[in-house]
Curated annotation (Swiss-Prot):
Phosphorylation at Ser-610 by SGK1 promotes its localization to the nucleus. Phosphorylated following nuclear translocation. Phosphorylation at Tyr-547 by ABL1 enhances transcriptional activation activity and reduces the affinity for RASD1/DEXRAS1. Phosphorylated at Ser-459 by PKC upon insulin activation. Acetylation at Lys-204 and Lys-701 by KAT5 promotes its transcription activator activity. Disulfide bonds: none annotated. Changing residue 459 to A: Loss of PKC-mediated phosphorylation. Residues 253-285 form the WW domain. It holds the Pfam family PID. Component of a complex, at least composed of APBB1, RASD1/DEXRAS1 and APP. Interacts (via PID domain 2) with APP (with the intracellular domain of the amyloid-beta precursor protein). Interacts (via PID domain 2) with RASD1/DEXRAS1; impairs the transcription activation activity. Interacts (via PID domain 1) with KAT5/TIP60. Interacts (via the WW domain) with the proline-rich region of APBB1IP. Interacts with TSHZ1 and TSHZ2. Interacts (via the WW domain) with histone H2AX (when phosphorylated on 'Tyr-142') and the proline-rich region of ENAH. Interacts with MAPK8. Residues 1-24, 131-254, 276-299, 340-365 are annotated as: Disordered. The gene is APBB1. The lineage of its organism: Eukaryota, Metazoa, Chordata, Craniata, Vertebrata. This is Amyloid beta precursor protein binding family B member 1. Transcription coregulator that can have both coactivator and corepressor functions. Adapter protein that forms a transcriptionally active complex with the gamma-secretase-derived amyloid precursor protein (APP) intracellular domain. Plays a central role in the response to DNA damage by translocating to the nucleus and inducing apoptosis. May act by specifically recognizing and binding histone H2AX phosphorylated on 'Tyr-142' (H2AXY142ph) at double-strand breaks (DSBs), recruiting other pro-apoptosis factors such as MAPK8/JNK1.
Length: 710
């Protein structure tokens, strides 16, 4: 016969007060955690004790039997006493305590089987009536004969004794020590208390908080299914003890990113979602608990707040006040790493001292100053500055100088200012280069004379600035390259603003001069709200040539006229007498400029060009212009390597101008002609009517159209 193990203290008290005072050899109280263990639900009375109670021969002595019963009862008392302190509902008993309690056991008298069964039946009924927290298990409420009880006890005695001994050994080795308490004070706790009893220990880690429910899942689930088959009114441990309720997770704005506050029966703790680590203290405070496992420390080092080697618990977060400081450093790294050379001040002294030594930098608000380092200059040709090629040529110069200047502090021989720290100032329509220490003016370049400027387009060249201008002494086109402390687009934007201002001032001055010569009485008031369209810049092509001069010719057209003029000039002059110049071809104007002085040698309107051709020599080119009534002039050029590009450009300009004239003439003919008088309209209508009548009658009279036209 198996003995029930789910009887509580209330059942035993009711049994002791409701009947005669009995001295029970077996304490029948069982803790709630024994109901969740599959191995303990079939705990049986030792076969030797049953044989002695039934009076069978060959049984053991009364003393050892009573000691066995008392030992089992005290073990159950210890398990019940420590149930509210064990988080995983494990039986808490050690071998040392078991050995220490054995000498204190007092021998009790043997009991008969019938008397023992009556006590068990009465206790089971009382436990069911009082509605215990765990479902009471009644073995049988029917009467059973002595023979049936003897057969069942004899068949199960040996197996139950072996299971009981193995179970006690496993529980003693795996459970923490617990102290027994009096029987009257043992009660099933209303809710399992995992981490709230007593002060919190720092040795609790994430495995304790997150692994409670999975530590004994198989045994717990199977045992509960067996115990609750007959009592559906009670809930399961999952229902009565919910660690994860909907309100358990809280997010707070005070917590750093990635942290969450969790509240459950164990208390309030903080969970770092990316790494999976937990801690009792808020993450924004001094340091984590001392119980952080080595695995948790290795996960914390992944965030990059410290080096990869090991740290002590007290030293790991010592130098890090918060999680925001490393983020600020991470934002600064891409900005400092954009340059290929080390980030350093462009002057030997720190920048604050340099600013103190340079008071004029910020005194005049009209001066824009930029700290730069000269990389030198590269000579350029006029062909490289042609439209569509200038940006590529300037970028090649930047690439050529910046890639070969690995050490910027080593000055190179060649041009002025090479490898030096300079101040680039934009003042009064002038670009100035000033020595930082002595404020000495090294170079001044009028902004209006700068041909091209640009910023490096390659990756890492955003701080390289270059401009192209003609040298005053050598008349050579030079591309000066600088490396700026700030992004070079600031200089380019400032230059663009200054050029726009200069062009606006010149436009206003030209309008003022023209306005003085106009009759103000004929001017029409224009409202100020009207927005005039911005003028479009025409495409200008420049070609470097030798200007042979111009001669008057008799006819405006003819290849023989051009060939005769070219032969006469080539035979009468030498190459040294030819003037180096360049021709600017625009859709409206052809301009001939001196290559060195940029003086205008000739300017011709495309609308007055009458004929153009290439001479017998492919290097020669000439065109004829109308200089006045019955006066024509032939301009001649020597081109390298041939005159094909120049002739095509002039021809394209002529065709474009001719097309514009046609467009303007067609619009004027449709919209600008005055309306015909009424008399002319009447004559035209009458003529149309007469013509219709004549066509009907088949008249073949000739029509005089000129007489009837207005």
């Amino acid at each position: 016969m198996s003995v029930p193990s789910s009887l509580s203290q209330s059942a035993i008290n009711a049994n002791s007060h409701g009947g005669p005072a009995l001295s029970l050899p077996l304490p029948l109280h069982a803790a709630h955690n024994q109901l969740l263990n599959a191995k303990l639900q079939a705990t049986a009375v030792g076969p030797k004790d049953l044989r002695s109670a039934m009076g069978e021969g060959g049984g053991p002595e009364p003393g050892p039997a009573n000691a066995k019963w008392l030992k089992e009862g005290q073990n159950q008392l210890r398990r019940a006493a420590t149930a509210h302190r064990d988080q995983n509902r494990n039986v808490t008993l050690t071998l040392a305590e078991e050995a220490s309690q054995e000498p204190e056991m007092a021998p009790l008298g043997p009991k008969g089987l019938i008397h023992l069964y009556s006590e068990l039946e009465l206790s089971a009924h009382n436990a069911a009536n009082r509605g215990l927290r765990g479902p009471g298990l009644i073995i049988s409420t029917q009467e059973q004969g002595p023979d049936e009880g003897e057969e069942k006890a004899a068949g199960e005695a040996e197996e139950e004794e072996e299971d009981d001994d193995d179970e006690e050994e496993e529980e003693d080795l795996s459970s923490p020590p617990g102290l027994p308490e009096p029987l009257e004070s043992v009660e099933a706790p209303p809710r399992p208390q995992a981490l709230t009893d007593g002060p919190r220990e720092h040795s609790k880690s994430a495995s304790l908080l997150f692994g409670m429910r999975n530590s004994a899942a198989s045994d717990e689930d199977s045992s509960w299914a067996t115990l609750s088959q007959g009592s559906p009114s009670y809930g399961s441990p999952e229902d009565t003890d919910s660690f994860w309720n909907p309100n358990a997770f809280e997010t707070d704005s005070d917590l750093p990113a990635g942290w969450m506050r969790v509240q459950d029966t164990s208390g309030t703790y903080y969970w770092h979602i990316p790494t999976g680590t937990t801690q009792w203290e808020p993450p924004g405070r001094a340091s984590p608990s001392q119980g952080s496992s080595p695995q948790e420390e290795s996960q914390l080092t992944w965030t990059g707040f410290a080096h990869g080697e090991g740290f002590e618990d007290g030293e790991f977060w010592k130098d890090e006040p918060s999680d925001e400081a490393p983020m600020e450093l991470g934002l600064k790294e891409p900005e400092e790493g954009t340059l290929t050379f080390p980030a350093q001040s462009l002057s030997p002294e720190p920048l604050p001292q340099e600013e103190e030594k340079l008071p004029p930098r910020n005194t005049n608000p009209g001066i824009k100053c930029f700290a730069v380092r000269s990389l030198g200059w590269v000579e350029m040709t006029e062909e490289e500055l042609a439209p569509g090629r200038s940006s590529v040529a300037v970028n090649n110069c930047i690439r050529q100088l910046s890639y070969h200047k690995n050490n910027l502090h080593d000055p190179m021989s060649g041009g002025w200012g090479e490898g030096k720290d300079l101040l680039l100032q934009l003042e009064d329509e002038t670009l100035k280069l000033v020595e930082p220490q002595s404020q000495a003016l090294l170079h001044a370049q009028p902004i209006i004379s700068i041909r091209v400027w640009g910023v490096g387009r390659d990756s890492g060249r955003e701080r390289d600035f270059a401009y192209v201008a003609r040298d005053k002494l050598t008349q050579m086109l030079k591309c000066h390259v600088f490396r700026c402390e700030a992004p070079a687009k600031n200089i380019a934007t400032s230059l663009h603003e200054i050029c726009s201002k200069i062009m606006a001032e010149r436009r206003n001055a030209r309008c003022l001069v023209n306005g003085l010569s106009l009759d103000h009485s004929k001017l029409v008031d224009v409202p100020f709200q009207v927005e005039f369209p911005a003028p479009k810049n025409e495409l200008v092509q420049k070609f470097q040539v030798y200007y042979l001069g111009n001669v008057p010719v008799a006819k405006p057209v003819g290849v023989d006229v051009i060939n005769g003029a070219l032969e006469s000039v080539l035979s009468s002059s030498s190459r040294e007498q030819w003037t180096p110049s360049h021709v600017s071809v625009a859709p409206a104007t052809l301009t001939i400029l001196h290559q060195q002085t940029e003086a205008v040698l000739g300017e011709c309107r495309v609308r007055f060009l009458s004929f153009l051709a290439v001479g017998r020599d492919v290097h020669t080119f000439a065109f004829i212009m109308a200089a006045g009534p019955a006066s024509f002039c032939c301009h001649m050029f020597w081109c390298e390597p041939n005159a094909a590009s120049l002739s095509e450009a002039v021809q394209a300009a002529c065709m474009l101008r001719y097309q514009k004239c046609l467009d303007a003439r067609s619009q004027a003919s449709t919209s600008c002609l005055p309306a015909p008088p009424a008399e002319s309209v009447a004559r035209r209508v009458g003529w149309t009517v007469r013509r219709g009548v004549q066509s009907l009658w088949g008249s073949l009279k000739p029509k005089r159209l000129g007489a009837h036209t207005p």
